[in-house]
């Protein structure tokens, strides 16, 4: 039974390695430059960089607390 398990695990491993070998890869420097370019192009729409207008912020309290 142990030999059967080992063979099954080896087949799964080989299949996974074949899948990973077929993945198209790019250089890290190319990926980094593409990512920086994307970030620079979309920075004006990023609410973390430009903020959210108070009129559009769904989390802002509509009324102040009466107790305070």
Swiss-Prot record:
Domain of life the protein comes from: Eukaryota
GO molecular function, one term: G-protein beta-subunit binding
GO CC, one annotated term: extracellular exosome
GO biological process, one term: G protein-coupled receptor signaling pathway
Keyword Cell membrane among UniProt keywords: yes
Gene3D superfamilies, sorted: Transducin (heterotrimeric G protein), gamma chain
Main location group: membrane
Residue positions where Cysteine methyl ester is found in the record: 65
InterPro entries registered for this protein in UniProt: G-protein_gamma-like_dom (IPR015898), GGL_sf (IPR036284), Gprotein-gamma (IPR001770)
Stored PROSITE patterns: G_PROTEIN_GAMMA
SMART domains in the record: G_gamma (SM01224), GGL (SM00224)
Propeptide stretch(es), residue numbers: 66-68
Entry comment describing in which tissues the protein is expressed: Expressed in a variety of tissues. Down-regulated in pancreatic and esophageal cancer.
Record flagged with keyword Endoplasmic reticulum: no
Subunit structure and binding partners: G proteins are composed of 3 units, alpha, beta and gamma.
Protein name (record): Guanine nucleotide-binding protein G(I)/G(S)/G(O) subunit gamma-7
Lineage of the species this protein comes from: Eukaryota, Metazoa, Chordata, Craniata, Vertebrata
Name of the gene: GNG7
């Amino acid at each position: 039974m142990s030999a059967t398990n080992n063979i099954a695990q080896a087949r799964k491993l080989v299949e996974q390695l074949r899948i990973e070998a077929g993945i198209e890869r790019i250089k890290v420097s190319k990926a980094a430059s593409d990512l920086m370019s994307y970030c620079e192009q979309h920075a004006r729409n990023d609410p973390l960089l430009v903020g959210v207008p108070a009129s559009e912020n769904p989390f802002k309290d509509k009324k102040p607390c009466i107790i305070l």
